[in-house]
Amino acid sequence: QGRGYTVKEYKKEYNKSNHDEYEKPPIYNFEMHVELYHKIYDTFNEKYADVKQRLIPDAEVPYRLHFTPEDFYVFVIAHAYKHYSSSGTGIRTLADIHIMNQKLGGTMNWEYVDSELRGLGIFSYERESRELAQKLFGIAELPTKANLSETEQQMLAYYLGASTYGTIENLTLNKMRKLQPDGGAITVHTKRKYLLSRIFPGREWCKAYAPTVYKYPVLLPFFWVWRLAVKGVKRRDIAKQELEAIKRER
């Protein structure tokens, strides 16, 4: 606070997540993490739970630690995929991937990188994003439908439509798709299941977002009532966007 920072407006609280967000006009925004991934991201959380063991000492500043280029690249891809697979992430992510490959691609141990990406289940995502980024930023001419495959066109449209921090529609649809067992069109049953999970979140959800309720599960029914009465009013605009996304999906 002495440096002019305040807790991000929409939270008005801290120590309630895996990171605290601080803002300072006109543009500064810092996220101070206590852990790199929520526990709901099982694979990523397990990988980076003890991140210090993956860091190496800096050659110039003895008290500073950092990733190797390979581990840095893998972490950035994992972080990008976390957003991509939930609410989405903007085209800036493709620019980041392209620049990293320009600067680091020629010296990285790709056998190690690919092994790490496969272990995290994001090998295909990295390859497809890297190839798309190369077509967008690696040539002087603007890309056309002629040199983008149908899959690449769809992927680009998803990136372009995600704004900077993703959209509620993407988040809602991606969550419903994860609930759809056969990977097909989202059914009425899946929509109902999703709505129930949003109105009555389970104990595992509370582990990340309501730790006190997770610790004392007897509070869960009271939490549901409070969530509907308080959050339902405060965040009614978001709830409306979710409902509209559910209705549009056929």
What are these regions (language model features)?
Residues G2-R250:
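Conserved NTP-donor binding/palm subdomain of two-metal-ion nucleotidyltransferases/polymerases, i.e.
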